Amino acid sequence: AAQATLENRCRNGQWDDAIRLLDQQKAASVIERGEAERLKAVLLTAKAGEKLESDPVGAREDAKHALKLAKSLVPAALIAARSYLREDNLRKAATVLEPVWKNDPHPQIAELYVRARSGDTAIDRLKRAERLESLKPNNIESLFAVAQAALDAKEFAKARAKAEAAARIEPRESIFLLMADIEEAETGDQGRVRYWMAQALRAPRDPAWVADGIVSEKWLPVSPVTGRLDAFEWKAPFGQLEGPVEDLTIENAIAAA
C-alpha cells in the first residue's frame, strides 16, 4: 500500500509530496535506508528536470542533492551541468560531470562534456574528448568519444584507431556506423562503406534507457507502463534482431575491410 501511494504521487508529478512520503516511510523503517536514498535521488532529479527551464539554479540544487545520495545518477549530473552551462560556467559543469564519468562512463555525459561550449573548434572538442579518455582509459565510451571527435577534426588515423579499439572491447551498431563514416570521409570507398554498414546491421544494438519492455530516448523517473519508480536502466534493449558480426570476430572484420 505504501509503495502504491508513493507511485501514485509520482504518476501525478507530485514530487514534493512523494519526497515527504518517502522520508516518512524511511523514518518508520517501512523502506530500507539505501533504497530510500536512491529513490529520493530519483525524485529530486525528476523535480529538477521539470524546472530546469524556469528555475535553473533551483534545478541545479536539487540535482546536486540527488548526486550526494546517488553519485552515479547520470540524469542528475546532466541537469546540474546544463544549469552551469547556461551561466557559461564550463569549469563547474566539468566538476559535476567528471566524477560521474569516472564512476560510470555514459555517452550522454560525453556528448554534453565534449560539446559544452558552442564556439569551440573541432580540435577543442577533440581535446575535451581526450580529457575524458584520460579519466577513464581503455573504456568503450571513452574510445568512442575520441573517435567521433577525431573524425570531426579530420584526424582520420586517430579516429580509425580509437573506433577499432572500441570495437574490440564491444562490437556495437554505433561503432560500425562510425567506421562507415570514417571510411566515407577519409577514402570515399563505397565498397568499404557498405561493408561497415552491413556489420552495423548485424551488430548488437547500443544501450538505451529501457524499462518494462519499452525504450525511451531520454531517462524518465517513472515507467509509463507500470508506474514503477526508478524503473529505467541503461542497457541493451531486449528482443533485438541481431546476427553474428561477419567472420565472428572484430579482428577478422577489421582485417577484411
Predicted feature locations:
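TPR/TPR-like (Sel1-like) alpha-helical repeat modules
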Residues: 7-28, 88-108, 167-173, 184-208
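Hydrophobic/aromatic side-chain positions at a characteristic register within alpha-helices
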Residues: 10, 51-52, 68, 84-85, ...
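Alpha-helical positions within canonical tetratricopeptide repeat
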Residues: 17, 58, 75, 91-92, ...
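Inward-facing hydrophobic residues that define packing positions of alpha-helical scaffold repeats
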Residues: 21-23, 63, 80, 97, ...
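Flexible helix-coil transition and linker loops at the boundaries of alpha-helical arrays
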Residues: 28-37, 132
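Alpha-helical adaptor scaffolds
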Residues: 39-52, 95-168
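C-terminal non-catalytic interaction modules
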Residues: 172-257
